[in-house]
Amino acid sequence: MWGLCKKHFPSNKIQVQERNKALKPKKSGSEHKTKQLFPVFNCKKKEKGVMIRFAILRNANTSLLSARSICLFTQAPTYCHVRLNTLNKSITTKRNSLTESKRHVHDGKHFFTTPHQQQQTKLGEIEEGHSPNIKGEDLRSIGQAITHQRNKRRKQIWSAIFGGIFGVILGYSLIYRVIYLKEQSFLPLFPSSKIRKLSTRDLKKVDVNQVQKLSKLRVLEILSGHDMIKEQYGVPLLDKDGNSPTLNEFSMWCEDQDPCVTGIVMEPDDKRDSSHTWYRIPFVCKWRITHRPISIRGTIDDLLNRIGLETADLFEIISPERVYGSFKYEYPLQGDSHALHLWFHGEIELDDDSLIVYNGKYHVDVKLQEIDLFRREKNGQLIQYVLYKNEAGDK
């Protein structure tokens, strides 16, 4: 028979709770940690409550307060009951929070996702480096870096393209034609004007003094037969000192019949004497800068000759060189494969307010194109009088 003394049973509720804590079995450290990490939601095996038998002696006097304490002690909840109640409360609070969050969602982007999942996605993006709170300066610096890299890459591509083209042209002109075939090669650089000054080599082939004298005689001959000159200046035409007028300025230049380009002429370094000024690369080649015309007809003839045809086999060209007064009958410079126009310009001063200006072309004889009189009138105006103009001539 089990029995309990009065001193072992508490008389109030606080003492009952303290007694329950004292009777609660202590858990080991490993079991306590595993229950914290992996909480048990469904306890299939419920811990049985402690059943205590009380036997009261017949002759013992037990008060009602002691009996009440014994009843409270026997009805105290176990640890498993308290744990299950706590877990049920936490699950119900989570469900209520999720339902409340779903009710308050009004954004279309959360139609298939919850705000909680969206926050997790944003956190993942931030961890990967895609932060939405990046400053504007950082974005601009990133954009500038990308633009700089693209421009650098574009420059490298274009540099490689132009470098390859230049290497192919230089290799063909210098290595193949000059060094291997021992021929002259011309490398064009940029287009040039048809009109250019006579070079030192050209001036050696043209008698400039003769052209100057002939042009002056032709001008005085035309002016002596002009009515305005006869009335206002008289015949023979004299200057302010009573002497024959003299030339104040005279110049000559040439004009090609075809478009011209400026380029580099390269030849094998054979050390022969030449009238041109050459720059030499020892044992490789010699080169100089010159102007050359681009003959379209000559280019077509060369292409047809390479495939065994001639121009007459395809079409007939009526060349202006066969017409009198054309380029064929202009002054041809010796050693050149093309004809040139030789132009001249002169000025004759009659007095302080009158100046004769003329220009023309030279071949075997002088052919004047235009003669003008520039005179300052009494009112101070400078007036140009056209005394002669060759309408049929080609300028």
UniProtKB/Swiss-Prot annotation:
Keywords: Membrane, Mitochondrion, Transit peptide, Transmembrane, Transmembrane helix
One cellular component term from this protein's GO annotations in UniProt: mitochondrion
Topological type in the membrane: Single-pass membrane protein
Localization of this protein: Mitochondrion membrane
Disruption phenotype: Increases frequency of mitochondrial genome loss.
Transmembrane regions: 156-176
Top-rank lineage group of the source organism: Eukaryota
Main location: mitochondrion
Similarity comment: family membership: Belongs to the AIM39 family.
Protein name: Altered inheritance of mitochondria protein 39, mitochondrial
